[in-house]
Amino acid sequence: MADKKEKLFSDFSPVSTEQWMEKVTADLKGADFEKKLVWKTNEGFKVKPFYRMEDLEGLKTTDALPGEFPYLRGTKKDSNEWLVRQEIKVESPQEANTKALDILNKGIDSLSFHVKAKELNAAYIETLLNDICAECVELNFSTCQGHVVELANLLVAYFQKKDYDLKKLQGSINFDYFNKMLSKGKEKGDMVQTAKALIEAIQPLPFYRVLNVNALSLNNAGAYISQELGYALAWGNEYMSQLTEAGVPAAIVAKKIKFNFGISSNYFLEIAKFRAARMLWANIVASYNPECLRDCDNKGANGECRCAAKMRVHAETSTFNLTLFDAHVNLLRTQTEAMSAALAGVDSMTVVPFDKTYETPDEFSERMARNQQLLLKEESHFDKVVDPAAGSYYIENLTVSIAKQAWELFLAVEEEGGFYAALKAGTVQAAVNESNKARHKAVAQRREILLGTNQFPNFNEKAGEKKPVEAKCCCGGHDTC
C-alpha cells in the first residue's frame, strides 16, 4: 500500500476564488454579476454560480454521520434502501387483493389501500389481505377520518388472529385531522380525543404510524419548497404539543407521526429539503426530552430518546406539474423527482402514473411508474450508497439555506399560536394560494419552465376526450371524510 495519498491533478497549480472571480468578471464583459449569474430562488435566498471548499467552513452539516442524530444524512447507517409503494383504490376487496398479489411479484414492497369506511368489517379486511404476508410488506391504509379507530381495531384483530409477530409489522393509517381544515376550512370531531383513541388502539403494532403530516397537499397546491417544509414542521409539532399536553408521552407521539412530502422538479433543492427536514424535526422532537420506552443505547446527553427523533418520510411525486397534454413528458418530470427523493434517503416512495391527471391509471402507466423506481434501484444502485450528496459544496449550502428559511417560517407559525391557530386564521391557506398564483403566472410568462407546455409543446397532439380528473376523497365522496 502507498504510504501517502496521491494527489490528483498535481501538475496543475491550484486556483483561488479570487482568480475564478477575475475570470468570471472578465467573461461577463461588464455585465452585472448578481443579475447574470446569481440565482434568486423562490425560497427567499440566493444561490451562487459556484461553490468551493471554503463555503463549507462553519457548516455543522458536514459533521453529521449516517444513522446518527440529528439524522441529516439519513436514519439508516448501512444502505439507502427505500420501499417502492403503489396505491390501490379498493372498489372490491377481492379485486384489490388480486391486484396486490400481482404487483407484489413485480417489485412493490409497500402497498397503500384506500378503503371505503361504510364497508369496513372483519370479513372485508380478511378478504383484502388474504395471502399477503404482512411481515414481508409495508401496509398503509386510508379511510374516512371518523373511522380510523375502527380500522385500527380491525387490523390488530386480524394480525393477532393470523398469529403474526406484531413487532415485524410495518405500516400506517392515514389519520390527519388538519388536512381537511387546510383544503376545506372545516373541522370534524376532536383531534386529541381521536388521536389518543387511535394510538391506544394501534398500541399492539409498535411500528405502525397513525398521525400523518400530509405536506404533500401543500406541494400539490403549488407551495414553494421552504413553505412545504416549514408548514410540515409546524404541522407535526402541533401533534406533539397538543398530545403531550393531553398526557401522551412525547416518545410515543413522535414515533406515531409520519411525514408525507411531495417532490417537485427542483432537483437539487429537493435533495436538500429532505436532508434539512430530518435535521430540523430531530431537534424539534429532542426539545420535548422524550423518554426511551425501552432500554436503548441511542440516548442524548440528557437521557432523551433519540430514536423518537427519527423522521419517517414517505415521498410522492408532485401532481402540480403533471400535464394533461403531451402527458408522456410527465415521465421525465417524475423520474427526476424520484431521483431527488432517492438520493435524499426517503423511507418509501410513490411515483404517480403519468396519466393520472386525465384518467384512472391503467396497467401500462402503473407498470411504468413502478419501473421508474426499480430502474433507480436495480440499474443505478441508488439504494446502495448512504447520502451520496454529503460533502457536496453546493448541496450542503442548499441544505443550510433551506433549513434557515423553513425554520423562520416554523417560528412564525409558532408565534401565531401554532399550526392549528394558523389554519383557523387562514394564514397558511393564504400563503400557499399566493404561491400558487405566482407560479402559474411564472409558467404563463415562461419564467418557470414546464416542458411540453411552455417549452417545446406538441402542437400536433390530438387530445381527444381528455379532461382533468375530479378528485374525490377515499370514501368516494367529497365532504363525508
Q: Model-found features: residue ranges?
A:
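Catalytic-core signal marking the mid-to-C-terminal active-site face
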Residues: A2-D3, R367-C481
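Catalytic alpha/beta active-site cores
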Residues: A2-N266, E270, C296, C307, ...
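Flexible, glycine/charged-enriched surface loops at secondary-structure junctions
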Residues: E34-L37, L166, E245-K256, S287-K310, ...
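Conserved, mostly hydrophobic/aromatic
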Residues: G44, G107, D163, W281, ...
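Mobile "lid/hinge" segments at catalytic clefts and subdomain interfaces of large enzymes
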Residues: P206-M240, Q335-L409
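Short glycine/threonine-rich loop-to-helix capping motif typified by GTGT followed
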Residues: A223-L229, S264-A276, S318-L331, E359-A369, ...
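Extended, hydrophobic alpha-helical segments in both membrane/secreted and soluble proteins
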Residues: F274-L280, I284, A315, Q335-A338, ...
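Catalytic alpha/beta core domains of metabolic enzymes, predominantly
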Residues: L293, D297, R312-S318, A327-H328, ...
